[in-house]
Amino acid sequence: MAEEKHHHHLFHHKKDDEPATGVDSYGEGVYTSETVTTEVVAGGQDEYERYKKEEKQHKHKQHLGEAGALAAGAFALYEKHEAKKDPENAHRHKITEEIAATAAVGAGGYAFHEHHEKKKDHKSAEESTGEKKHHLFG
């Protein structure tokens, strides 16, 4: 088993198995004294795109939180019904109901948090473009 290759990563890259060569294929091992300067300008468009991407991610997470709250709430109601239907195991069903209700509240809080993060990113995206909307009452 020691001689087998163990891959701990999800994807295996073929270039890892190739032996390293002594010659650099990009520059063929030749050095020059020429210097190339590249200027990178971080414009407002890149910042705007980043904020919009984050806003989309927060919206997706908000929807996952809402779905989790809905599922946990439905399970809590189911356990409440089972507690009435099965009196022998009513105590176990009541405990499970409380745990599910707590999970529903937590998921709802997470959805609420992501909603506010989404609003914050939306506002930041508007500010990064330099255009402000004129809200008269607020």
From Swiss-Prot:
Source species, domain of life: Eukaryota
Disulfide-linked positions: none
Region (Disordered): 1-27, 106-138
InterPro entries: ABA_WDS (IPR003496)
GO CC, any one term: cytoplasm
Additional note from the record: Plants silencing ASR5 exhibit delayed flowering, abnormal panicles, reduced seed number, reduced number of trichomes on leaves, palea and lemma, and exhibit sensitivity to aluminum and drought stress. Plants over-expressing ASR5 exhibit enhanced tolerance to salt stress, osmotic shock and drought stress.
Protein name: Abscisic stress-ripening protein 5
Organism in which the protein naturally occurs: Oryza sativa subsp. japonica
Organism classification: Eukaryota, Viridiplantae, Streptophyta, Embryophyta, Tracheophyta
